[in-house]
């Protein structure tokens, strides 16, 4: 089985459903597949001795060593779009090591899970957490990103750089 994703009558990607979800070819497909949709934020790519990093306004996130280094190299010092799905962000207890933190604006109970809408420096991130997560609206949420699930997109062309 394959799904064709089109935008304005133009085929964006023709792939099995899991490939569309795991390896979207551009920002449109990444945002189209999945509910809630993928989170996006601007970051700057940095090269350090221990690998590549994505710098946000509040710090840096180490990128997976599995990412294509040749694809990342031309983007050092440039702004790209980082994408990550809500289920690939963990809300951890405050005080634990984390990548980002932000204020919980909405805690949307969905039954066995809760969708946290977190304001991170003016960017709204949706985080899918267990319904037992103790944080509520107004609290600070400490977030850990699954580095193996980070997607990077060219800010100008919107094409995928690396997954």
Residues covered by each model-derived region:
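Internal alpha/beta loop-helix hairpins
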Residues: 1-60
